[in-house]
Amino acid sequence: MSLTRRNFVLGTSAIAGAAIIGAPRYAHAAAESLRIGWLAALTGPSSAPGIGFDRGVKFAADTLNAAGGVKGRKIEIVTRDTQGDPTKAVNATQEMINSQKVHAIWGPTNSGESLAVTPIMARAGIPNIHPCVIDTLIDTKKFPNAFRIAPSNGQWDDAVRSYCLKVLKVKKIAIIGDTTGYGVTAVKACVANFKRDGADVVYSNNIDATQTDMTPDMTRARSAGAEVIVIWSVSTGMEARLFNTRAEMNWDVNFAGHPSMASGEIRGLLAKPQNWDKVYAVGYRSCSYGADGKLPPKSQEFVDKVQGKVSLDDTLFWWVTAGYDAINMVAKAVQEGAGSSKDIIAYWNTLHPYPGYFGNYTYTAEEHNGYPTADVVMSAANSAKHGTFLLAPGYV
C-alpha cells in the first residue's frame, strides 16, 4: 500500500530550553530490537518535510525488516510527533533516551527544534542524524554525536546568492523569512552575505507564516526596486500566498530560495498554476533531471524501488531519500559491528563517503557536515516529477 498524502503546510518553531538526561547505553542483547528515535513534525503548520521524511523512514525500516533486520535485530522506529514545537521536541527527546532507551535518534526536522534538543542529545552521547540547516547545529567539539545529512544553510545560501548574482544577474535584493528561529537566523545571514558580495538589499523582513495578507510586504519590496525576492521559510502556505500576491500585483519578479517553495503542497494553494512560474528553489543534483527528462541513474533506481509503495508526487524526493538514508546509516553502523552509542558515532566518523540515495556523505571526527557543496543547485520549482525537478535555467 502506498503511503498517502497528508495535506499539511509548514511553519512555526521557536527555541526552548533543554534538560540534563541520562548517559548512553552500550552492549545490547542480540535479539533486542534496534530502536531508532524519530523526532518529526507530522502535524501542524511545519509538517510537510516531516511527512516526506517519514515515508523514507518507514520504507527503509520495512525493507530492512523484510530482509531479516540487522544481524537478526528488528528495526523499531520510535516516532514522536513534535508538531514543530521545540518544547514538545525536548520532552520527546528525554522520553526517547530515558524511557524508550533508543540507540540513535533521527531528527528533528526543523532548526528551531534542533536548537533546543541538540545539547540534550550531546550530553547523553546519543548518535544523532538530522537535516536541520542552521550552521551552528554542527560543532564537533560541542556536539560530537551530531551529524548533518543535508546541506547547511550556508551551502543553501551560497547556491541562492550565486544564482541571483551570476545567472539572473540582479543586484537589488528583497529577502523575506518567517518568524521561526530558522527564519530569523537565515534572513540575517543572507542579508549579510549579499551585502558582502556587493548586492543592494533593498528590503528585508520576517513575517508570521500564518499572515494571510502578503500585499504590504510585497508592495514595500516592489517600491524599493527589488529585482528578485529571496525566501527563507518552510511554510508552503506563506510561500503560496506570496506567489499569488505577486500575480495579483502584475509584478514579473523572480523568487529564489528555500527548497519548500517546490513542495507539491503548493500546487493546491495557488490561485492559478502559472503563479508558480519564475520560482527557483534550492535543489540537488541527485534530485534533478536534465532537458532530456532523465534523472541520474542511482536516483532513478530509487524511484523504481519505491514505485507503488511510496508516493512521491506530493512531496520532495530529497525528503524521502534523506529519511531512507538516515535509517540505513544507523543500520549500517550496527551491521559493521557497532555495539554501543559510542561505536555508532565512531563508525560514522569513518564514512568517506557513504553512498546514499540523497547524496554521498563524507564525515570525519572533525567534520560532521556531510553533504557535498557541489551537488547543491537551483531547480525550477513548478517542474516536479516524482518529487524531482528540472535544473533551473543557466546550469549546464
Listing of model-derived features with the role each one plays in the protein:
Residues 1-16:
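N-terminal secretory signal peptides and thylakoid transit peptides that target proteins
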Residues 243-324, 381-385, 389-395:
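Extracellular/periplasmic periplasmic-binding protein-like sensory domains
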Residues 49, 53-60, 89-93, 113-117, ...:
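Stable alpha-helical elements in mature extracytoplasmic
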Residues 48-55, 68-143, 149, 207-214, ...:
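Beta-alpha junction/loop-to-helix N-cap segments that form part of ligand/metal-binding clefts
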Residues 305-321, 327-387:
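Segments of small-molecule ligand-sensing domains
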Residues 1, 23-42:
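C-terminal segment of N-terminal export signals and the immediately downstream linker at the start
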Residues 37-56, 80-87, 109-110, 176-184, ...:
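Extracytoplasmic "Venus flytrap"
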Residues 102-205, 254-281:
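Extracytoplasmic ligand/sensor domains, especially the bilobed periplasmic-binding protein
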